[in-house]
């Protein structure tokens, strides 16, 4: 894909990353300080989804494209697990 052209997945993942950033900021300000390392992990894995989807748009090969999206999927799974930890 070319710069300036975004897929629906790219747009949604960027919006999700923005919500993750806002949520983690709120948790750092108002949440239990003992969970700060978990908040930071949510931030890392949650924003990595969008970063990898963005990288996939400029993949050097079909295999590279698939690899980037697979990494994004794994980061999404990790983020969900950390969010479940915080929910409990």
Language-model regions: role of each:
Residues 1-88:
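Amphipathic alpha-helical assembly/interaction segments
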């Amino acid at each position: 894909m070319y710069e300036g052209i975004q897929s629906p997945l790219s747009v949604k993942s960027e919006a999700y990353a923005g919500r993750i950033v806002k949520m983690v900021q709120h948790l750092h300000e108002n949440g239990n300080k003992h969970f700060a390392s978990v908040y930071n992990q949510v931030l890392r894995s949650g924003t990595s989804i969008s970063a990898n989807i963005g990288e996939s748009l400029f993949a050097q090969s079909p295999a590279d494209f698939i690899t980037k999206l697979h990494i994004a999927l794994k980061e999404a799974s990790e983020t969900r697990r950390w969010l479940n930890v915080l929910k409990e």
